A protein has these predicted regions:
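Acidic, glycine-rich loop-and-beta core segments that form the ion-binding/anion-interacting portion
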Residues: 159-214
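Repeated scaffold domains used in trafficking and secretory/extracellular systems
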Residues: 1-2, 28-41, 72-85, 115-130, ...
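Contiguous hydrophobic segments
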Residues: 38, 62-88, 194-218
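Solenoidal tandem-repeat scaffolds enriched in leucines and small polar residues
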Residues: 85-175, 183
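Short beta-strand elements that form the blades of beta-propeller/WD-repeat-like
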Residues: 2-9, 14, 36-52, 56-57, ...
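Aromatic (tryptophan-biased) beta-strands that constitute blades/sheets of beta-rich domains
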Residues: 1-3, 11-34, 65-74, 102-115, ...
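Beta-propeller blade signature
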Residues: 56-64, 149-160, 199-206
Length: 218
């Protein structure tokens, strides 16, 4: 898989070798591609079907062989999120993370078709960014009960119950529009906009570690 370039056009994923030759292709004409990630030596592609962007297939990157699939309700528009340990999707409504066998380990946000009530603590919030590294999932979101604030939340990527988030810390950033820019195993950094923008870092216990001035976002 080393050196392969993965592209998508006209319903086809194409893996290209460094010398420009075609390694393999994967075609799917019945659904549009929503997101594309890589992890564990696999290509992970999510497609839009009758359950939103919830039809996901894992393909061996080196050979193009089918590995596994999963299908579940998801948002209509998503972006990929990944680390060496997890792959998933993020939308303004929800976050889903999966391990290498495509079993979901995190379900967070406004979850449709809930099997049990009262599992999600912040269903009415709007997610603005998310990043993950090993056992750390960080996200930012805004909530209607506290306008003008961005919440930075840390949670475990392997909670006891994938349907019930394990929130490690909630950080109240008193600025609208803050976004994650980096994540570590036990910390994260956010860009805080305003007249004097800053990059602020916090550990996963919610303690501020550092704050440095930054250029305004374009």
């Amino acid at each position: 898989e080393t050196g392969l370039t993965i592209t998508h056009a006209d319903h086809t994923l194409t893996a290209t070798n460094p010398d420009g030759s075609e390694a393999w292709t994967y075609e799917r004409t019945d659904a549009d591609l929503c997101s594309l990630s890589t992890a564990w030596g696999k290509i992970v592609a999510s497609y839009k079907t009758g359950v939103g962007c919830g039809d996901t297939v894992a393909i061996e990157a080196a050979t193009g062989e089918y590995d596994s699939t999963r299908s579940a309700v998801n948002s209509e528009k998503v972006v990929p999120v990944s680390s060496n340990d997890r792959v998933g999707t993020v939308s303004t409504d929800r976050i889903d993370l999966w391990r290498s066998d495509m079993v979901r380990t995190v379900e967070y946000g406004d979850v449709e078709a809930k099997q049990e009530p009262d599992k999600q603590p912040h269903e009415d919030c709007t997610i603005s960014s998310a990043l993950t590294r090993t056992e750390n999932l960080a996200l930012t979101e805004s909530c209607p009960d506290k306008p003008g604030t961005t919440w930075l939340r840390f949670q475990d990527t392997t909670p006891d119950d994938s349907r019930e988030p394990d929130i490690a810390a909630d950080v109240d950033i008193a600025t609208d529009g803050a976004r994650l820019v980096a994540v570590g195993q036990k910390a994260a950094a956010v860009y805080r906009p305003g007249p004097h923008p800053t990059i602020e870092s916090y550990d996963n216990k919610g303690e501020k570690l550092d704050s440095t001035s930054a250029e305004p976002s374009p």
